[in-house]
Every structure is written in structure tokens, then in C-alpha cells.
Amino acid sequence: MPEALDASPYDALLLLSFGGPEGPDDVVPFLENVTRGRGIPRERLKEVGQHYFLFGGISPINDQNRALLDALRKDFAEHGLNLPVYWGNRNWAPYLTDTLREMAADGRRRILVLATSAYASYSGCRQYRENLAGALATLEAEGLEVPRVDKLRHYFNHPGFVEPMTEGVLRSLAELPEDVRPGAHIAFTTHSIPTAAADTSGPVEEHGDGGAYVKQHLDVARLIADAVREETGIDHPWQLVYQSRSGAPHIPWLEPDICDHLQELHGAGVPAVVMAPIGFVSDHMEVLYDLDTEAKAKAEELGLPVRRSATVGADARFAAAVRELVVERAAVESGQKVTPCALGALGPSHQLCPVGCCPARAPKPAAAGADSPYA
């Protein structure tokens, strides 16, 4: 039996994710949840939902999260970490509020949260914290005992996140035709967000103008590119590019878009491309449609050989990283001195989101941070 690891004061881990439809009848109601409050007509949502209908109305994110749950539980058991793992979503079943209600009924009083977003941004961090605050307020209104909730730090530069992606890029390069492989370009991709949101991501005192979102992605891209060079002896050119833009066209978002980037690379005579979706934990719809369908169609139109590397998903190294992050945060809460594990130039992220981190346009209460009403 492995020596028991101590997660106290925590008594549960919550995997918190975006959610997605599980069949055609779920697509429009799911999109109504995603766009709630924006007044988007149902007919327009049916048009937007075509991405999901192409895949039978099923988002891959749910099975990806189920696989991650299994990987986490397996890793915890193998390493003597007695910590139950639950799952809740922002936009679809199992809904976050229902899961927290279940956890409260099970007697869970100190909960750690793993969000399926590795980087600092409003949509990837603070919005989840707002969701947590809203769910806890519901429990409070129902007269239930409200658990204390903390969130694991950003893990974008943890070895257990970076190394599987590096391996995926190397594998994709090896899959390219041998005659074009040496000149291949690596396009590191992530979700585009409004430039205003990017500029205010993370604590301003840490990241200044430009925010944490882009800087964190660039740090990961450099780590992977450097590791690829060490392994192959080839200094492949690379760039951070964006995908999955939405919203009003007059609002500036991060650019260039991956399809525009492929067009530019083709015009410059680049012989092949590896698309590396470093901004995503798993192969969900933005990866399967925007890269595997749309971007690959663009590359085929251009006659440009392209491969898409794998996301981390349920890789055992990522599950191990989560275990390490849990033990690390538990030690911090117990007053122990810890040395957080992190690669790259930026170092480990903060354990507790400070006041004013990743602000929203309309401020809302947010749990699991220095400004939490549920400390």
C-alpha cells in the first residue's frame, strides 16, 4: 500500500468544466444556457448549433471529463490520496449547483476546485469563480450548510501539463511527410478573447499592460518549442495564434486567426504546419470543429500538409500533476512551506486570486479568491 498523502483540510475535489450537449435535443437548450441574458433568438442558436449537429449533437467534452475523472480517481488511489472527486458544469448536466448540493449532503465542508482551464482570464477563471459564488448563494438560500471552496492555482506551466503537449507536437511532426518535416512551422493555438479581456487578465501588478493570458501562452509555447529543438535538433519556427472567435465583429479580439495564419504561411512558402492547441485541456468542440474540420479544410484547399497535436486530456501525467497541486495547496492551507512546481520564465501562479484579478464588465460576487464572500 502506498504511504497516505494528506489533503487536509480538504475533504473533496470538484472538477469544474464548461459542459456540453449529449444529444441533438440538448443542443439549443445548452446554447441558451451559454448565451443567457444576451437575447439571442432561438433560430440563431439553431444555426450556431450546426457545429454540434455535425457530430450528432454530442459534445466530446463530457466523455473527456469522464475519462479525466477516472484518471484522477485511479491516480489518487494508487498514491494513497483519500479524496473523493466530483464533477459539475457551468452550462449543462451535471450542473454545478446540483453537484455542490450533493457534496453538501455528503458532508463535504472544504472543497478544492480544478477548473478545466489552465490560464488566467475572465472566462477561464473569474467566471468560474462567479459560478461558484452563485451556486453557493443558492445553497445558502435553501438553508444548507455552505462549504468553503478554494480553487487550484493556474497550472499552465506545470510539467504534467506541458510535457504531454510537447510529446504530442513531436508525434505530429513525425507524422508529416519526411521531405517537408524539417521546414514545418508550429502554430500554437488558443481560444481568442476580446483584447480588453486579455489586457486585464491576471493581477495587474504582476503582468502590467497586456495581461497574463497572452504571456502565459507564450511561455508555454517557448517551453514546447525549446524541448522540440532539443529532441530533434531542428529549430522549428512558431507563432501563437487564435481560434474560436465569437461576438460582435466591431469588438477587437486577439489575432491572427488560425485560418488566416495558414493562408499567410502558405503564401510565405512554408511547406507544412503542426497545429498545437495548447490553450485547451481536452479535445472538445473548439478543437474538433475549428481545427480538425475548419482549419484542416483550409489547409487542404491550400495544399498545405498539416497535423494537429493532441491535447492533454486524461494523460496520466496530468492526473499526477493535479494530485501534486492538491497536496501543494493542502500544505499551504496547513501553514507549511512549499516549493510549487513550475517550468518557464513566469514561475508558479498565485494560490489565491487577488482582488481585481480578471475583472468582469459588470462586477459579480466571486468565490475562491481574496474577495470571496464565502471565505
From Swiss-Prot:
**InterPro entries, alphabetized:** Ferrochelatase, Ferrochelatase_C, Ferrochelatase_N
Sorted keywords for this record are: Cytoplasm, Heme biosynthesis, Iron, Lyase, Metal-binding, Porphyrin biosynthesis
| Signal sequence, start to end | none
Please verify whether the record's keywords include Metal-binding.
Answer: yes
Write down the superkingdom of origin: Bacteria
A GO term, aspect molecular function: metal ion binding
Q: Which EC number(s) does the record attach to this protein? A: 4.99.1.9
Report the enzyme's class at the first EC level.
lyase
Q: Where in the cell is it found?
A: Cytoplasm
> Which residues take part in binding Fe-coproporphyrin III?
59, 128
Predominant cellular place of this UniProt entry's protein: cytoplasm
Q: Listed GO cellular component terms?
A: cytoplasm
Quote the pathway field. Porphyrin-containing compound metabolism; protoheme biosynthesis
Q: According to its UniProt record, which reaction does this protein catalyse?
A: Fe-coproporphyrin III + 2 H(+) = coproporphyrin III + Fe(2+)
- What does the entry list as the binding residues for Fe(2+)? 191, 286
- A GO biological-process term: heme biosynthetic process
The record ties this protein, via PANTHER family, to: FERROCHELATASE, FERROCHELATASE, MITOCHONDRIAL
**The family this protein is said to belong to:** Belongs to the ferrochelatase family.
Q: What does this protein do?
A: Involved in coproporphyrin-dependent heme b biosynthesis. Catalyzes the insertion of ferrous iron into coproporphyrin III to form Fe-coproporphyrin III.
- Protein name in the entry: Coproporphyrin III ferrochelatase
Q: What organism is the protein native to?
A: Streptomyces avermitilis (strain ATCC 31267 / DSM 46492 / JCM 5070 / NBRC 14893 / NCIMB 12804 / NRRL 8165 / MA-4680)
Q: Quick one: which gene encodes this?
A: cpfC
